[in-house]
């Protein structure tokens, strides 16, 4: 009888202890390889208790190759997200709602048609064709590499073949531009600003992608190390994750999507070209208005109890200088995360940095400070 009660626990024991034990043994053996293995990633440095060595001897400065590697890592993460059915459904529903609230009602059916036609193709392309190395070369974070002998051209071709634009009259085919003037006038009473519409939808997609959550997920590993080292770890995460996510989402999506689907010029779809590697100008950082909105809402709710914080944030949106609709949308999307950060002792600026709406200057000497560092 005793055996029958003991058996389930014996079966559970490998599940509860096995992975951690096996991982510890694996890392113990791997750490014996020395610094070359320790400093390949933050996780390996922590597991081998060599974070201090890696910070001082290997990670002391941010080089162009570091940015390239981090860009590729984040691109793989975003591409993986694009493959998730739940994420696709959320983005699709969100964009359909955005189509319905466009200021010019005439554009709503066209916007829906744009989604119906091209959303599945773009998702399929990200799933099967998009290469992180190519993405990061395209946005200027990796140096261009010459194609290896025997390999085909860079992966614009497959999507361009599919997006022959058979269903969208009036799309510019030869000379790209912000509007479809002098095209398809017999079908639409006004020129249809396809590139503007594309840019508008792409910017709204960025609100669905949880930049702050992704950066905070990376930062979770910092909590398993001593406080001082944990603060340095948080500094590294701030330097890489949030800045690169802002860069990739703000520059990559308009260039890749609007440039491919509608042949919008880079000036129309993504603003000026990216600067050379090694410099990260202030324009890469989040817009001041978004940062100010986050700071204001968080500050106004800072003195409230944990239960009253969401209501206090919504009340803050009644401020006369705020865009109320934008503020309420921001609170709806971010209140739970902000509440968690504020209740943990983070001030408004730190919380908004972690959320991704505010960012510190990109400098090895200036990092976000957690309550413990």
Swiss-Prot record:
It is found in: Secreted, Extracellular space, Surface film. Glycans are attached at residues 73, 303. Residues 24-64 form the Saposin A-type domain. GO terms for biological process: respiratory gaseous exchange by respiratory system; sphingolipid metabolic process. Gene3D superfamilies: Saposin-like (1.10.225.10). Residues 1-22 form the signal peptide. Disulfide bonds join 68-142, 71-136, 99-111, 195-264, 198-258, 222-233, 291-358, 294-352, 317-327. Pulmonary surfactant-associated proteins promote alveolar stability by lowering the surface tension at the air-liquid interface in the peripheral air spaces. SP-B increases the collapse pressure of palmitic acid to nearly 70 millinewtons per meter. This is Pulmonary surfactant-associated protein B. It comes from Bos taurus (Bovine).
